[in-house]
Amino acid sequence: MRHLIEEYGIGSQSFEAVKQVLKEQGALLQEGMILDATIMHAPSSTKNKKGEPDPEMHSVAKGDQWFFGMRCHIGVGAASGLVHSVVSTAANVHECNSAAERLHGEEKVAYGDSCHLGIEKREDFEGSSCQFRIAMRPGQRRALPDALKGWLEDLFEMAKAHLCAKVEHPFRMSKHQFGFQKTRCQSIKKNDDNLKMLFALASLYKIRK
């Protein structure tokens, strides 16, 4: 069954179908978007017929640790917290490189963590009217002056962080409720299809009431 689902891209089709229904019901508002990504570790046991690790997966450093696998980039509605877009890449692909695919072009504002700093200068967003409200780097925030201006900037950073926390819900659902903490099969495309199915279910779960 799983192979049939992967072969026909049922996960991607389900994700688009759920998204369309949510739009028609007015649940998936498009004026604001939150951008984020997470690394999906590829276990060494997931090997091809030659006994080699998946060649599409790559290593990347995050802090002082190295990870091998893929990166799942998502765009989440700032108002609804529902997943609007999913882009899967090798782990070494920077988050800014997938930003244009995660935004639909009608946003008035987009939020993201400090990994997205400088996004507004990219060619993809030249002439865009979207406001990019990207978090400061932790070191910059710690260095804010202990004065009124610094306090106000820190409050603004707190507000952005509180809003961006909405993006953690679909990641938590996919990893903990649905158990997708590591890649499940060969190829980024197949894992992407699995993830889209889970994010569709996460959106339905979120609006169940």
Report residues per predicted region.
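Polybasic low-complexity intrinsically disordered regions
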Residues: M1-Q131, R137, L198-L204, K209
